[in-house]
């Protein structure tokens, strides 16, 4: 069974190894500077940073995944939304219902949110889970400028 707990600075080694695996998987379509990924980890464990929360997912006391949740406001929904960002599980832990449990837990922790949002790449097998849970596609293409 999976357990969910807040990420701490002591998790840096284990989490950053999983972050590296996530960013070198088909779930990500572009390269991200490792310094940016480390900065995101630091923000996720900083209690003074209200916009991101990091979770460590454990099976039998061993880290097997991580998840970042990010809060935002959307004019389109007239309220807050929760970005379910970077949900990663080790391959041997997939297909056990852990992803659904983590997503439901995150949604229960943030009932104030009017939308729960996530991103998937084309062909991501996890999309079937998300659709089963009630997520639907919005036909937007993202455009960004990074600074």
Predicted features and spans:
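Conserved GNAT-fold acetyl-CoA-binding loop/helix
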Residues: 16-43
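A conserved beta-turn-beta hairpin within the catalytic core of GNAT-like acetyltransferases
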Residues: 73-84, 94, 138
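Conserved beta-strand in the GNAT
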Residues: 56, 62-71, 83, 88
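Conserved active-site alpha-helix within GNAT-family acetyltransferase domains
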Residues: 100, 122-139
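Conserved GNAT acetyl-CoA-binding A-motif
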Residues: 109-121
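A short helix-loop-beta-strand connector motif used in the catalytic cores of GNAT acetyltransferases and
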Residues: 43-56
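A short beta-loop-alpha structural element at the N-terminal edge
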Residues: 3-15
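Conserved acetyl-CoA pyrophosphate-binding loop and the N-cap/start of the following alpha-helix
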Residues: 93-105
């Amino acid at each position: 069974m999976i357990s969910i707990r807040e990420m701490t600075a002591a998790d840096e080694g284990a989490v950053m190894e999983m972050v590296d695996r996530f960013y070198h998987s088909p779930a990500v379509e572009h390269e991200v500077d490792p310094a940016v990924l480390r900065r995101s980890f630091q923000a996720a464990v900083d209690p003074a940073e209200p916009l991101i929360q990091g979770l460590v997912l454990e099976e039998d006391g061993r880290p097997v995944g991580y998840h970042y949740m990010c809060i935002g406001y959307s004019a389109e929904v007239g309220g807050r939304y929760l970005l379910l960002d970077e949900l990663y599980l080790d391959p041997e832990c997939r297909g056990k219902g852990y992803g659904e449990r983590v997503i439901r837990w995150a949604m229960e922790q943030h009932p104030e949110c009017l939308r729960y949002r996530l991103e998937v790449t084309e062909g991501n097998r996890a999309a079937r889970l998300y659709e089963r849970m009630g997520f639907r596609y919005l036909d937007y293409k993202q455009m960004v400028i990074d600074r």
